[in-house]
């Protein structure tokens, strides 16, 4: 596996070339080879088209998503939630989902030097060309990386500055939203920067958002009209449609048809979407990861995800086994990990471990469990 990766890296190095011409039009992909040449460290970070990526038609997609994890590629590309949502959206007819990550300082400097917007790694389209740009906010310190990515993408940082053009207008900025445990636990510090915030689990919520956006584009709705429609979707919080009450603290809807309280979404884990892509470079979690349990019954007050992801939901043992077996065959990884806030609380763990050992006995693979 490592030998194949090194060979791919050498091929990538051979393919990059130096040029001063960069395509900045939103109608076309960026001139990748002019932007990411041999002067950029680890160019394979930005190549995209990893093992497991399926080509998608930009022109026929009705809604184009770019999901981002606001860290460098080695961190973001191995995030399980990021991969699951990416896979789910690409399984929805008419929807296209690409990925983007925080560029390292050398590429960020070159993007600014050449006035080129940050681009997605598969289509290599500038991020302003997408309909929806989503950020995973997993911890507070990631917020500044989001602002950096918005600036690099040449998207107005504050939601109030993004105008009211219909999303179908080429000049309209994409819808900017955040999700993840930090955005769910306390969205208000980040509210000025997002058109909406997705609260709770996204597996079922994001496809619903995509359907609303597709209809809004077909109807030619303005940005504000679309946000009014999105606010009716359970789990979607639109900060611009809420204001503080008389006490200056409590949030109240500005329109009577809006929900007074936005509740987070709770979804059933979908391990069959967890089969990740095999990156061109080594990542922080360089293995297959399959979720076996979401939530926790311990109730430790210091544990944010344990308090937020309730109730605890176990994945069916056979679904875990099939996801691991399929994923190992498709990726070629030699290691896999079973993920949970507390793996020892997954009652089927011994039986799953024995069955996986029996099925994968001749493949010389290693099981890792989080501490």
Task: Explain the meaning of each model-derived region.
Residues 65, 70, 76-87, 91-98, ...:
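Low-complexity, highly charged intrinsically disordered N-terminal segments
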Residues 16-43, 92:
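Helix-enriched interaction subdomains in cytosolic or periplasmic regions
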Residues 303-319:
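Iron-sulfur (Fe-S) cluster-binding segments and ferredoxin-like electron-carrier domains
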Residues 1-14:
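Single conserved hydrophobic/aromatic residue that forms the stacking wall/gate
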Residues 102-252:
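Glycine-rich beta-alpha loop elements in corrinoid/cobalamin-binding modules
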Residues 67-71, 86-89, 277-301, 328, ...:
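N-terminal pre-triad scaffold of radical SAM enzymes
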Residues 67-72, 141, 326-371:
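Conserved SAM/AdoMet-binding glycine-rich loop
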Residues 36-66, 73-74, 239, 244-289:
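N-terminal [4Fe-4S]-dependent radical SAM core
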């Amino acid at each position: 596996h490592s030998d194949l990766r090194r060979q791919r890296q050498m091929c990538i190095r051979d393919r990059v070339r130096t040029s001063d011409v960069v395509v900045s039009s939103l109608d076309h992909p960026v001139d990748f080879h002019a932007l990411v040449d041999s002067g950029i460290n680890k160019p394979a970070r930005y190549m995209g088209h990893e093992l497991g990526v399926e080509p998608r038609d930009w022109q026929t997609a009705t809604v184009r998503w770019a999901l981002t994890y606001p860290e460098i590629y080695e961190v973001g590309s191995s995030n399980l939630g990021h991969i699951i949502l990416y896979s789910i959206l690409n399984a929805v007819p008419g929807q296209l989902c690409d990925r983007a990550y925080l560029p390292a300082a050398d590429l960020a400097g070159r993007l600014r030097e050449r006035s080129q917007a940050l681009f997605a790694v598969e289509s290599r389209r500038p991020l302003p060309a997408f309909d929806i740009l989503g950020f995973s906010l997993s911890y507070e310190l990631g917020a500044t990386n989001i602002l950096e990515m918005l600036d690099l993408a040449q998207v107005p940082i504050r939601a109030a500055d993004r105008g009211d053009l219909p999303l179908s207008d080429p000049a309209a900025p994409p819808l900017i939203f955040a999700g993840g445990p930090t955005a769910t636990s306390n969205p208000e510090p980040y509210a000025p920067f997002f058109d909406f915030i997705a609260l709770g689990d996204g597996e079922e919520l994001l496809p619903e958002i995509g359907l609303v956006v597709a209809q809004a584009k077909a109807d030619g709705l303005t940005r504000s009209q679309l946000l009014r429609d999105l606010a009716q979707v359970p789990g979607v919080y639109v900060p611009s449609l809420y204001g503080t009450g008389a006490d200056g603290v409590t949030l109240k809807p500005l329109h009577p048809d809006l929900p007074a309280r936005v509740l987070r979404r709770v979804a059933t884990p979908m391990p069959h979407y967890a089969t990740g892509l095999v990156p061109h470079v080594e990542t922080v979690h360089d293995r297959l990861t399959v979720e076996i349990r979401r939530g926790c019954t311990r109730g430790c007050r210091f544990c944010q995800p344990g308090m937020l992801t309730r109730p605890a939901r176990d994945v069916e043992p056979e679904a875990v086994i099939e996801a691991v077996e399929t994923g190992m065959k498709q990726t070629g990884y030699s290691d896999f990990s079973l993920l949970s806030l507390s793996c020892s609380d997954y009652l089927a763990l011994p039986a799953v471990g024995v069955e996986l050992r029996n099925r994968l006995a001749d493949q010389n693979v290693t099981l890792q469990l989080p501490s």
